[in-house]
Regions:
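N-terminal helix-turn-helix DNA-binding core of bacterial DNA-binding proteins
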Residues: 11, 22-64
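Charged, amphipathic alpha-helical coiled-coil/dimerization segments
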Residues: 70-132
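Long, contiguous secondary-structure blocks with strong helical propensity
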Residues: 55-75, 126, 136, 140
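Recognition helices and adjacent regulatory flanks at domain boundaries
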Residues: 6-7, 14, 23, 60, ...
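Short, locally clustered residues in the helix-turn-helix/winged-helix DNA-binding domain
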Residues: 14, 42-46, 105, 132
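A structural signal for well-ordered alpha-helices, especially hydrophobic packing surfaces
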Residues: 17, 101, 135-138
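C-terminal regulatory/oligomerization modules of transcriptional regulators
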Residues: 1-3, 49, 122-140
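N-terminal leader segment of winged-helix/HTH proteins
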Residues: 1-31, 75-77, 92, 99
Length: 140
């Protein structure tokens, strides 16, 4: 059995994960947002949605989501409006919410590029598949 080492791939993966997590959180904190708010903004960027659909997509209860949505609405990042072809009551990004979402997405893309920038497209796909497989193994 291999002895844990700071030079091992697993050690470096853990270290990179912790540092990437901090890097992703930085613009959230700077904008007064909480971890997880970015997931809501990213999901709403596709188009407006109902609270029930958003909660299901994020794997949250509607009650857990409600407080977050109230806070984001108070900060003028989302608005409650009719959405979809049936004009159901729902939520969508405001102009301010869209700007913040775009800034967060750009920051995310920069971190992704720092991770994958030296890899060719084929190697990027292979690396992503290997990480996905590893995550699935750990979830078992």
């Amino acid at each position: 059995m291999a002895k844990p080492s700071s030079r091992s791939a697993l050690y470096r993966l853990i270290e990179a994960g912790q540092l990437a997590h901090k890097a992703v959180l930085l613009p959230l904190v700077e904008k007064g947002l909480e971890p997880g708010d970015d997931a809501i903004l990213f999901e709403l960027a596709r188009s407006g949605t109902t609270e029930a659909d958003l909660a299901a997509e994020l794997g949250m209860t509607r009650d857990a989501l409600a407080g977050r949505l109230d806070r984001l609405a108070d900060r003028d990042l989302i608005t409650r409006q009719a959405v979809g072809p049936l004009l159901e009551p729902g939520i969508a990004l405001t102009e301010r919410g869209t700007r913040i979402r775009n800034a967060l997405a750009e920051h995310w893309a920069q971190i992704e590029e720092a991770l994958m920038g030296e890899l060719k497209p084929k190697s990027r796909k292979k690396f992503s598949r290997a990480l996905a497989r590893f995550v699935e193994l750990l979830r078992l």
